């Protein structure tokens, strides 16, 4: 007897399920995101059931034998860095980013690097035909006989291809285009994305094939589909950057086999993505000399210190309420620091519009750049350039104190490497710096004390 389809209403944003339609999702609060989906209990059981899964008895954790971790290197050092040192066998990696940011380009270049090492790789595209992939590969210079390509969206066909071709690395581009015939909903729906990811996860763990899942993002920048998708995978990478800027940042926000918040920096060119081995030099290459409103600081991305230039412009406001336009920084943090400057430094910023930008389109969110924000605003407000070859570090509290920051040694080492000769750091960090040769490091306790040393 044929089972009738069960109708459920599912939120396309968070995966919340309800027996009837609602205009607003009660779980995530999104309007008009709940759509009708049809499925059967039998089909769901079929999708979740592994092909052959004999029951495994529990074992004591100390009796489990560890094999030597053999990571595959993609020949793209910035990607390997973001992954924590290469590809772990059986890992499931989700990479998301805005349309046109370079996700598919990065995947093709990574597979080309692996194919050149003799690794058998498979690129599954649900968005392009093999001819279109070949055209793009010709432009990128990534044509290789070891790079297998197939255009397919049906999960049964894809798993059959994987079983017959036995690739050592797999890319699915994209997970939102995959389709399970057992489910009546359209490709890209929450249930389709969830079930496709489950089947690929079971395959990856069983066969040991490292698998990349390329994911679309929503207009708020989150990966489209259920949040369960990010919980299910081993690594989540976000490809960030403005399409109007040439730099791209690959950021690891989750990594079971490496450091989180690790980044890789790339530059988009006509022939694809180029690695940026020394981001500090690139971000500071066009910095104007002796310009008011410019401050340099060392931001820590994962374990990697990068020197960035913060730019500020304070100008008299033409409106009753001054404007605060911030790019690349936390606007709330800048507003907080502006209030501290009014109270502690006596600068009447309420009559000034404040515009701030991080040069190169980088995003900086850590509190360790607070003193650089204060310095850039003060420099523009007073129309005085900061002393040459000076870098400013430190977190600022509401009472104007400058607090110690982490990884001070690696930050100061990067400052020295880039040729800066003077560094203002929190007084609490002075004793932790082991090597002071070739650079003058000055401890500061308050923002008012720092203001006297900046110019």
Name each region found by the language model.
Residues 2-13, 17-83, 88-96, 101-112, ...:
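Peripheral, non-AAA+ core regions of ATP-driven protein-machinery
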């Amino acid at each position: 007897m044929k089972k009738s389809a069960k109708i459920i209403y599912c939120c396309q944003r968070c995966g919340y399920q309800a027996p009837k339609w609602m205009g607003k999702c009660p779980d995530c609060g999104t309007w008009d995101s709940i759509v009708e989906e049809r499925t059967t209990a039998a089909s769901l059981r079929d999708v979740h059931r592994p092909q052959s899964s004999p029951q495994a008895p529990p074992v004591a954790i100390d009796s489990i034998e560890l094999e030597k971790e053999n990571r595959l290197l993609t020949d793209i050092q910035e990607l390997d860095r973001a992954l924590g040192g290469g590809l772990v066998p059986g890992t499931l990696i989700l990479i998301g980013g805005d349309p046109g940011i370079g996700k598919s380009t990065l995947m093709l270049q990574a597979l080309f690097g692996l194919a050149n090492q003799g690794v058998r790789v498979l690129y599954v595209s649900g968005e392009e035909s093999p001819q279109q992939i070949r055209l793009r590969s010709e432009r990128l210079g990534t044509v290789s006989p070891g790079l297998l390509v197939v255009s397919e969206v049906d999960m049964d066909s894809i798993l059959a291809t994987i079983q017959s071709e036995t690739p050592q690395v797999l890319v699915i581009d994209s997970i939102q285009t995959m389709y399970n015939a057992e489910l009546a909903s359209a490709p890209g729906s929450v249930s389709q994305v969830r079930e496709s990811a489950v089947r690929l996860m079971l395959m990856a763990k069983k066969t040991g094939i490292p698998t990349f899942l390329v994911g679309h993002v929503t207009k708020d920048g989150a990966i489209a589909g259920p949040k369960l998708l990010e919980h299910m995978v081993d690594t989540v990478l976000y490809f960030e950057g403005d399409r109007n800027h040439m730099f791209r940042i690959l950021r690891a926000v989750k990594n079971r086999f490496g450091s989180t918040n690790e980044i890789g920096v790339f530059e988009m060119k006509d022939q694809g993505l180029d690695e940026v081995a020394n981001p500090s030099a690139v971000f500071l290459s066009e910095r104007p000399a002796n310009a008011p409103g410019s401050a340099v600081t060392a931001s820590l991305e994962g374990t990697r210190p990068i020197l960035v230039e913060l730019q500020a412009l304070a100008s008299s406001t033409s409106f009753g309420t001054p404007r605060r336009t911030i790019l690349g920084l936390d606007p709330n943090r800048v507003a907080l620091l502006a209030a501290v400057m009014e109270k502690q430094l006596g600068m009447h910023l309420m009559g000034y519009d404040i515009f701030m930008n991080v040069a190169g389109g980088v995003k900086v969110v850590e509190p360790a750049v607070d003193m650089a924000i204060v310095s850039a605003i003060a420099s523009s407000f007073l129309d005085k350039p900061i002393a040459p070859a000076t870098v400013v570090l430190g977190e600022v509290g509401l009472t104007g104190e400058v607090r110690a920051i982490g990884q001070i040694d690696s930050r100061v080492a990067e400052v020295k490497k880039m040729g800066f000769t003077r560094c203002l750091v929190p007084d609490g960090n002075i004793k932790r710096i082991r090597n002071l040769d070739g650079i003058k490091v000055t401890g500061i306790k308050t923002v008012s004390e720092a203001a006297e040393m900046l110019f």
